[in-house]
Amino acid sequence: MLWRGVMLYYLLAFVVILIDQWTKWLVVRYMELGESIPIIENVLYMTSHRNRGAAWGMLQGQFWLFYLITIVVVVGIVIYIQRLQPTQRLFGIALGLMLGGALGNFIDRIFRKEVVDFVHTYIFNYSFPIFNVADAALTIGVALMFIYTWTEEKQRKGMSDGANSTHD
């Protein structure tokens, strides 16, 4: 049973990678670099963009650093997934999303020497940095990990408060 549960998190990562790579292939195949297609005017655009760095274009061209960091992160995520308990489903989903996102962008860095980005949003007239499915999966995974950690801490604190209370 535990093995089957763990496999679901790897399956989630695989689905993220498939969707990420498919959408990037579509952008590379059918859009010119810099081309922008409005999805919801003034809110959401599909914009063909390339990034040789990290989020928001930081550390441009530092391929070996990204390779090393990604390998360490992926190994760490796999170790955590293997140690998950059946009750840690939300944490497993978070790790699966993070694994898929990390590997999705890693595939780009290995084969394209750059990451294909295309989701371009404007939030209150702010042009948010262009991102992709892998970035979204990583972000959602990290958010879920924080939610899981916060709820676990609240439950632990609640249990310890209950154990320390006195009854007349």
Curated annotation (Swiss-Prot):
Q: What is its EC number?
A: 3.4.23.36
Membrane topology per record: Multi-pass membrane protein
Query: What compartments host this protein?
Result: Cell membrane
Q: What does this protein do?
A: This protein specifically catalyzes the removal of signal peptides from prolipoproteins.
UniProt KW RNA-binding keyword: no
Per the record, the pathway is: Protein modification; lipoprotein biosynthesis (signal peptide cleavage)
InterPro entries found in the cross-reference section: Peptidase_A8
Q: Name one GO molecular function term.
A: aspartic-type endopeptidase activity
Q: So what family is this one in? A: Belongs to the peptidase A8 family.
Native organism is: Anoxybacillus flavithermus (strain DSM 21510 / WK1)
- Keywords, in A-Z order: Aspartyl protease, Cell membrane, Hydrolase, Membrane, Protease, Transmembrane, Transmembrane helix
Any signal peptide, and if so, which residues?
A: none
- Primary location class: membrane
- Record's Pfam families? Peptidase_A8
Any idea what this protein is called?
Lipoprotein signal peptidase
Any GO BP annotation: proteolysis
